């Protein structure tokens, strides 16, 4: 198993395995393969040390991944909360941030449904 950016990558095609790293999407993985001239259809275990080193070097130089990216995202959210803007308030309350409806749906952000007793007539 190859280890890049602190993540054990499975023995799948290179472009698929690279997406297991937080911050690398399918298109980014293809760009990395293109930049390092590695065949994206090659399995991870078939790569030699020079190819792995080239991939590591491109990722370190051009991409924010794993811990650095998670920290940056968390700091961005904290900044929004500290300045008290609308988006920060929505993050603080655990509600959808990007204008979605909340009268129905929004269960992912709001959590499990809390049933309230209905009004008696």
From Swiss-Prot:
Gene Ontology CC: one annotated term: cytosol
Biological source species: Treponema denticola (strain ATCC 35405 / DSM 14222 / CIP 103919 / JCM 8153 / KCTC 15104)
Residue span of region Disordered: 91-121
KW Ribosomal protein (keyword) present: yes
Task of the protein: Located at the top of the head of the 30S subunit, it contacts several helices of the 16S rRNA. In the 70S ribosome it contacts the 23S rRNA (bridge B1a) and protein L5 of the 50S subunit (bridge B1b), connecting the 2 subunits; these bridges are implicated in subunit movement. Contacts the tRNAs in the A and P-sites.
Subunit structure: Part of the 30S ribosomal subunit. Forms a loose heterodimer with protein S19. Forms two bridges to the 50S subunit in the 70S ribosome.
Pfam families: Ribosomal_S13 (PF00416)
A GO term, aspect molecular function: tRNA binding
Gene3D superfamilies: 1.10.8.50, 30s ribosomal protein s13, domain 2
A biological process from GO: translation
Protein name: Small ribosomal subunit protein uS13
Family: Belongs to the universal ribosomal protein uS13 family.
HAMAP family: Ribosomal_uS13
Superkingdom of the source species: Bacteria
NCBIfam families listed in its UniProt record: uS13_bact
SUPFAM superfamilies, alphabetized: S13-like H2TH domain (SSF46946)
Keywords: Ribonucleoprotein, Ribosomal protein, RNA-binding, rRNA-binding, tRNA-binding
């Amino acid at each position: 198993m190859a280890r890049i950016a602190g993540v054990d990558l499975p023995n799948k095609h290179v472009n698929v395995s690279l997406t297991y790293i937080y911050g690398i999407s399918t298109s980014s993985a293809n760009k990395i393969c293109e930049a390092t001239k590695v065949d994206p259809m090659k399995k991870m275990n078939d790569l030699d040390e020079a190819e792995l080193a080239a991939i590591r070097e491109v990722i370190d130089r051009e991409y924010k991944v794993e811990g650095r990216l998670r920290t940056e995202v968390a700091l961005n959210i904290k900044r929004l909360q500290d300045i008290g803007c609308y988006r920060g308030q929505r993050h603080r309350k655990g509600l959808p941030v990007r204008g979605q409806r909340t009268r129905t749906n929004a269960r992912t952000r709001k959590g499990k449904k809390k049933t309230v007793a209905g009004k008696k007539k």
